[in-house]
Amino acid sequence: MAHIIEITDFSAPELDIYARLTENQLVNRADPENALFVAESPLVIGRALDAGCTPVSFLMERKHIEGKGAEVLARCPADIPVYAADLPVLTQLTGFHLTRGMLCAMRRPRLPSVAEVCANARRIAVLENIMNPTNIGAIFRSAAALNVDAVLLTAAGSDPLYRRAARVSMGNVFLVPWTYLPEGESWPDLLHDLGFRTVALALREDSLALNDPRLLAEPKLAMVLGTEGDGLASSTIAACDYTVKIPMSHGVDSLNVAAASAVAFYQLALLNG
């Protein structure tokens, strides 16, 4: 049985990880061996455990200890701290109503190299400076559903392990392999060295159609999506082998990046991956 610790005061220091440390502070770039993230809801926590993430502690509504949290707790060491409180205490925690009554602090896993993530991959997504955790989560959910083998991110973008990103992804940030691209070098060249051809999603008049036979014939394809608002950098588009855009109607000029990713993944990965 887990080690249950009753919490009656929102100011209790045991709640600092969950209530007072920012997600950037939890990342702890100065001491990556002790970096943490917080997963929320039994579904997301369960998928993190499936991926081998190590739990540090739990915070949960007391009634869930023997309820919907019991199965998750049964998978964890018997001495793991489980901070339990009644709902009036926990509702002081911003966004607690979205957690399904359960939070878990976990060790951040070691990220693999780009070569490791891309080994045996045929269709990958590259996310350049995408800042919104909701978009990151939605893209990962689409990637898992639509046959994308891996996701690569630039370091300036949002963290897939942020609570909102993991929640929106339905835990699929723990299913789809991912890592960050190295800073200070040309990642299109790196992907070319790994055998990938790159396709930029961008609003250019000379863009190809998504079902262009040249794209469908590529054995290894990296689909490159850009930041909200501005899209991909001009230098990135120039470095890619192809540029495509999604046909629009009714005068609409573009889709949200998460919606655009789903359309591209469906055409280029699920149907032709």
Region spans (language model):
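Anion (oxyanion) recognition and catalysis
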Residues: L49, C76, H192
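Active-site/ligand-binding-proximal alpha/beta "capping" segment
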Residues: V199-V252
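Structured adenosyl-cofactor binding patch, chiefly the S-adenosyl-L-methionine
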Residues: M102-C104, S142-L146, G157-V173, S234-G273
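A glycine-rich helix N-cap at a beta->alpha junction
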Residues: R75-G95, T179
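Boundary-proximal intrinsically disordered activation/regulatory segments immediately upstream
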Residues: M1-E71, G157-S158
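Short, aromatic/basic amphipathic alpha-helical patches
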Residues: G67-D79, T236
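RNA substrate-binding interface of SAM-dependent RNA methyltransferases
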Residues: I5, P109-D206
